[in-house]
Design a protein with these regions (language model features):
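Short, glycine- and small/hydrophobic-rich beta-strand elements in well-ordered beta-sheets
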Residues: 2, 36-61
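Generic alpha-helical secondary structure signal
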Residues: 22, 32, 52, 64, ...
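Glycine-rich beta-strand-turn "strand-cap" elements at beta-sheet edges
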Residues: 1-10, 50-56, 86-116
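An amphipathic, aromatic/His-enriched active-site/gating alpha helix that lines ligand/cofactor pockets
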Residues: 7, 34-46, 65-99
């Protein structure tokens, strides 16, 4: 599939790391799956995805891209997000770190193909 240049990139990116106890894994995945399905339909959500670390067990990284800071703020106060936050607070987290990046500019690039 050929990549095309995006017409508008995110103004805000959120990246969060969750290191959870193995016993909470399935519940965590169910929570996140539901939250992602709801959030992807919200105004301004450009993407929202989860990736599992392939080396460290039960370590996950969430990333979100938002068109505007206002869209993200509306998400933060929404009932579905608040419900997810409350449910996550019941988990045993070994670590949780989140960063919000304000994007001032971006440049599209096609990554080079392998040199074979």
């Amino acid at each position: 599939m050929a990549a095309s240049a995006p017409t508008l990139g995110p103004a805000v990116i959120v990246v969060a790391l969750y290191d959870i106890e193995a016993a909470d894994r399935d519940f965590f995945l169910d929570l996140v799956r539901t939250d992602i399905e709801i959030t992807r339909g919200k105004p301004g959500c450009l993407w929202y995805s989860l990736a599992e670390d392939v080396v460290e067990d039960n370590v996950f990284r969430l990333s979100e891209g938002w068109a505007t800071r206002e869209d993200l703020e509306a998400h933060f106060v929404s009932e579905p997000f608040q419900r997810t936050v409350a449910a996550v607070s019941t988990l045993t987290l070994r670590d949780r770190v989140a960063y919000l990046y304000n994007i001032s500019g971006a440049e599209f690039t096609n990554l080079p193909a392998s040199a074979e």
